[in-house]
């Protein structure tokens, strides 16, 4: 067996290693982030829909007070590391777990547009310039009463939390790649000791007697 064949195996191993690192570094973070965002958005939308059909609907029907609803949502917000808001269709803040709403000084999200999410229930970004310095995953669930949309429950979740999970999964990918490369080295060693060297000796012996 010619030496060039063995070098081809070594070269193939190096190419596999380089491309493996490039693929994990280039594609895995993006694909993982998109998957985690969709997964988290689905989870938050379920929570927002539940809030909309219970606390928020009761608030609009005057079956409970805003203070009572805020107390419940503050607890949920703290447990889930989220910001929960109730917003009117015009963008007026009805409730926000990060602050007290003053009825006399109405807070309004001026650029709020619920139609911007047509075809989706979540968005990633500053949420209509509400959080210009922090990217958020925001989900909206409509509050309906008497077959009309009275407002929206909005839940914001920091993208930095998703990126932390993304980096952890990326580290796992690197560990798996390292294991595969190690196994490849073991296969290369076995090939060298069991196949390449014996055949090389046979080839040399044949050449000597030729």
Residue ranges and their predicted role:
Residues 1-93, 98-101, 164:
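Juxtamembrane segments flanking the first transmembrane helix
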Residues 12, 25-33, 172, 176-197:
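Cytosolic-side ends of inner-membrane transmembrane helices, especially those
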Residues 59, 144-146, 154-174:
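Helix-start (N-cap) segments at beta->loop->alpha junctions
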Residues 70, 96-134:
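Extracytoplasmic/periplasmic sensor domains and loops in membrane signaling proteins
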Residues 149:
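Glycine-rich acetyl-CoA-binding "A-motif" of GNAT/NAT acetyltransferases
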Residues 194-210:
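Membrane-proximal alpha-helical signal-transduction linkers
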């Amino acid at each position: 067996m010619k030496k060039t064949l063995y070098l081809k195996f070594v070269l193939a191993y190096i190419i596999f290693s380089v491309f493996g690192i490039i693929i994990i570094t280039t594609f895995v973070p993006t694909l993982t982030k998109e998957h985690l965002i969709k997964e988290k958005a689905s989870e938050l939308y379920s929570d927002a829909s539940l809030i909309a059909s219970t606390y928020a609907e009761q608030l609009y029907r005057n079956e409970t007070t805003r203070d009572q609803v805020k107390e419940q949502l503050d607890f949920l917000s703290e447990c889930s590391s989220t910001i929960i808001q109730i917003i009117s269709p015009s963008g007026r803040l009805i409730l926000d777990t990060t602050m007290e709403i003053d009825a006399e000084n109405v807070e309004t999200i001026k650029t709020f547009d619920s139609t911007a999410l047509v075809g989706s229930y979540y968005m990633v970004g500053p949420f209509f310039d509400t959080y210009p310095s922090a990217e958020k995953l925001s989900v909206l669930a409509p509050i309906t009463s008497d077959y009309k949309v009275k407002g929206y429950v909005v839940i914001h979740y920091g993208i930095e939390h998703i990126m932390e999970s993304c980096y952890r999964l990326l580290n796992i990918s690197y560990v798996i790649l390292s294991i595969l490369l190690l196994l490849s080295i073991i296969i290369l060693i076995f090939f060298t000791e069991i196949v390449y060297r014996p055949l090389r000796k046979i080839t040399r012996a044949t050449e000597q007697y030729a």
